[in-house]
C-alpha cells in the first residue's frame, strides 16, 4: 500500500482543491514544486524553501544517479538526509533528461543506452534501473520510466512512442512492487497532441493502476492552445480520486490555466532559472531588471510583496547593480522573490477554489496584467 493519501476537498468548475498526505508531511493542492535538480534548489537553503510556502520539492533521478551516485546518497539514508529536506520529495524517472540531454542515445525495448553528459561514459537506463535508483533515493513520489514524445511528431511516431511508454509503465509497476517500495508511483500519460493517443495511454495506465497520473510531453514546445486542448480532453477521463500532475509547466499563466483545467501539481525550473537571468515575476507581469529604466528605481520588485527581497527593502536599482556586477546576491534574492510569488499564487488559487470564487480570481489575475481573460471551453470570448 502506498504511503500517499489524497483527499479531494472541493471543486470550483474544473479547478480542484485537495490535500496530499505523507508520513513526512502534507501538501495542499494545487501545489507548485520547486525543482532541486542536483539535490538543492539553486541559491537558497532548505529552511528558506519551507518559509516560502513550499511543502514538496522535486529531485532529478538522472543527474543524481550520474553524480554523486547512489553510494554517496545511500550513505546518507536517501535524498532527504543528503539534501537536509525533511518534507516530501518527488523524483522524476530520468526519462525526460535521457531524451533531452543525453548524447548518442540508443532506444531499444529494454531501455536507453546513452553517453553520460558528465564524463562520456556509456550508461544504460531502463524501467527497472529507474525504479531501483528511486528506491535508493527514498522519494515519496516515484515517476515511471517513459519516453517523452517530441514535438512536433507525426501521429505514427507519437503512437509508437506512447505504446513503448505503456510497456515500460507495466515494467516500472512490477519493478517498483518487487522492490517492496511503499512510495507512491505515478503513471505518465503520453501521446503528443493527439487526443485518441492520450486516451489510449490513460486507459492503459489505469488498467495497470497507479497512485497518481502525470501528464507528460506538454512542455516540449507545443503551442499553448494545443496543451490546453489536451488538458481539456483528459480532465473528464482522469480518475477524480487520484492526483494529477502536469510535468514541466511553467509560466504563471500556465499554472492558472492548468488549475482551471483540473491539474493538482506542477513543477518548473522557470522561477529559479529566470531569477538567475534577472527576470522577476510579479502580479502585473515580469520585471526584467537588466532594463536601463531600473537604474535609479527605488521601488522593490513588487511593492507590498512579502518575500525577503521586497520586505527587506532591496530596490530594483540595487538588484540591477548586483546583476550587472555578477554578484551572487542578485540571483539569491531573485530566487527568493520568484518562488515566493509562485507559492503565493498557488495559495491564492487554493483559497479562491475553497471560496467558490476561482472564476473571479482568474479574471483579476489577467486584469492585473492588462490582459484579457482567455475563454474556457463553453464560454464566449
Curated annotation (Swiss-Prot):
Catalyzes the base-exchange of a guanine (G) residue with the queuine precursor 7-aminomethyl-7-deazaguanine (PreQ1) at position 34 (anticodon wobble position) in tRNAs with GU(N) anticodons (tRNA-Asp, -Asn, -His and -Tyr). Catalysis occurs through a double-displacement mechanism. The nucleophile active site attacks the C1' of nucleotide 34 to detach the guanine base from the RNA, forming a covalent enzyme-RNA intermediate. The proton acceptor active site deprotonates the incoming PreQ1, allowing a nucleophilic attack on the C1' of the ribose to form the product. The keyword Oxidoreductase does not apply. The active site is at residues 92, 267. This is Queuine tRNA-ribosyltransferase. InterPro entries: ArchSynthase1/Queuine_TRR, TGT, TGT-like_sf, tRNA_ribo_trans-like. Transmembrane segments: none annotated. It is an enzyme of class 2 (transferase). PANTHER family: QUEUINE TRNA-RIBOSYLTRANSFERASE (PTHR46499:SF1). It comes from the Bacteria. The gene is tgt.
Amino acid at each position: 500500500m502506498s504511503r500517499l493519501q489524497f483527499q479531494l476537498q472541493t471543486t470550483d468548475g474544473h479547478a480542484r482543491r485537495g490535500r496530499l498526505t505523507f508520513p513526512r508531511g502534507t501538501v495542499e493542492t494545487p501545489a507548485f514544486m520547486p525543482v532541486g535538480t542536483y539535490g538543492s534548489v539553486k541559491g537558497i537553503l532548505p529552511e528558506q524553501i519551507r518559509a516560502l510556502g513550499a511543502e514538496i520539492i522535486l529531485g532529478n533521478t538522472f543527474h543524481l544517479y550520474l553524480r554523486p551516485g547512489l553510494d554517496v546518497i545511500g550513505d546518507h539514508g536517501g535524498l532527504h538526509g543528503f539534501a537536509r529536506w525533511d518534507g516530501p520529495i518527488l523524483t522524476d524517472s530520468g526519462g525526460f533528461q535521457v531524451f533531452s540531454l543525453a548524447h548518442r542515445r540508443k532506444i531499444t525495448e529494454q531501455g536507453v543506452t546513452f553517453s553520460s553528459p558528465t564524463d562520456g561514459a556509456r550508461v544504460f537506463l531502463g524501467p527497472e534501473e529507474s525504479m531501483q535508483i528511486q528506491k535508493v533515493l527514498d522519494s515519496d513520489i516515484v515517476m515511471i520510466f517513459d519516453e517523452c514524445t517530441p514535438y512536433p511528431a507525426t501521429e505514427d511516431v507519437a503512437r509508437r512512442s506512447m505504446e513503448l511508454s505503456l510497456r515500460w509503465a507495466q515494467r516500472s509497476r512490477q519493478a517498483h512492487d518487487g522492490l517492496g517500495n511503499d512510495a507512491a508511483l505515478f503513471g505518465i500519460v503520453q501521446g503528443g497532441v493527439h487526443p485518441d493517443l492520450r486516451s489510449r495511454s490513460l486507459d492503459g495506465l489505469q488498467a495497470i493502476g497507479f497512485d497518481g497520473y502525470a501528464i507528460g510531453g506538454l512542455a516540449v514546445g507545443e503551442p499553448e492552445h494545443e496543451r490546453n486542448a489536451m488538458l481539456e480532453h483528459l480532465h473528464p477521463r482522469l480518475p477524480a480520486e487520484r492526483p494529477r500532475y502536469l510535468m514541466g509547466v511553467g509560466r504563471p499563466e500556465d499554472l492558472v490555466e492548468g488549475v482551471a483545467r483540473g491539474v493538482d501539481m506542477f513543477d518548473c525550473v522557470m522561477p529559479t532559472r529566470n531569477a538567475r537571468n534577472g527576470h522577476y515575476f510579479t502580479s502585473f507581469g515580469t520585471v526584467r531588471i537588466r532594463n536601463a529604466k531600473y537604474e535609479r528605481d527605488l521601488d522593490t520588485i513588487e511593492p507590498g510583496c512579502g518575500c525577503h527581497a521586497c520586505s527587506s527593502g532591496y530596490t530594483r536599482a540595487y538588484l540591477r547593480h548586483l546583476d550587472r556586477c555578477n554578484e551572487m546576491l542578485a540571483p539569491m534574492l531573485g530566487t527568493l522573490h520568484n518562488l515566493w510569488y509562485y507559492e503565493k499564487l498557488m495559495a491564492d488559487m487554493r483559497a479562491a477554489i475553497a471560496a467558490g470564487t476561482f472564476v473571479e480570481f482568474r479574471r483579476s489575475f489577467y486584469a492585473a496584467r492588462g490582459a484579457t481573460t482567455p475563454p474556457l471551453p463553453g464560454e464566449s470570448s
